[in-house]
Amino acid sequence: MINVEIVRNYNKWREHKQINKSLIKKITQNILLRFDNFSKIKQFELSILLTNAAEILTLNKQFRNIEKATNVLSFPSNELNWQDLYSKLEFLGDSDYMHLGDIAFCYEVIYNESCEQHKTFENHFIHLLIHSILHLIGFDHQNDTEANIMENLEIEILSYFGIFPPY
């Protein structure tokens, strides 16, 4: 079971009714089912903040020391590494609950990027959601090898949902 908490701090998000708990749960479940190590955990929780440029700028400055609005920020609850998920999950014990983390999305940046890249707002959001969840479970793109692995997984998941790959 996946519990999703959504906080909408910016009214423009309400125009996108298809961005809801059901969509976020479906995508999260699709990602987690790709990793056998998550099968022991019965309940996952994910917190989503749908906000604006001013708030994301504050968060980006506070947590990354970058004074710029960004499309999305991911805050993992656990220090997971996709290459060693089994031992990391064993370390967490026999808990049947895991809070994956928090994700903050910025409406204005996502809107501008989707226009510039000729994508629908929703498809761009889905791509960023997939990208962020992968960060929460230990994926990164600090070097070319990691970036290729993460991008290929994103492409595979996007294709499953009928979305053309952005790369």
Curated annotation (Swiss-Prot):
GO biological process: rRNA processing
Gene: ybeY
Cofactor binding remark: Binds 1 zinc ion.
Major localization class: cytoplasm
GO function terms (MF aspect): metalloendopeptidase activity; RNA endonuclease activity; zinc ion binding
Enzyme nomenclature, EC number: 3.1.-.-
Task performed by this protein: Single strand-specific metallo-endoribonuclease involved in late-stage 70S ribosome quality control and in maturation of the 3' terminus of the 16S rRNA.
Name recorded for this polypeptide: Endoribonuclease YbeY
InterPro entries, per the entry: MetalPrtase_cat_dom_sf_prd, YbeY, YbeY_CS
Keywords from the UniProt entry: Cytoplasm, Endonuclease, Hydrolase, Metal-binding, Nuclease, Ribosome biogenesis, rRNA processing, Zinc
Native species: Rickettsia peacockii (strain Rustic)
Family: Belongs to the endoribonuclease YbeY family.
Keyword Hydrolase: yes
Binding site for Zn(2+): 131, 135, 141
Cofactor section: Zn(2+)
High-level lineage: Bacteria, Pseudomonadati, Pseudomonadota, Alphaproteobacteria, Rickettsiales
GO cellular component, as recorded: cytoplasm
Compartments where found: Cytoplasm
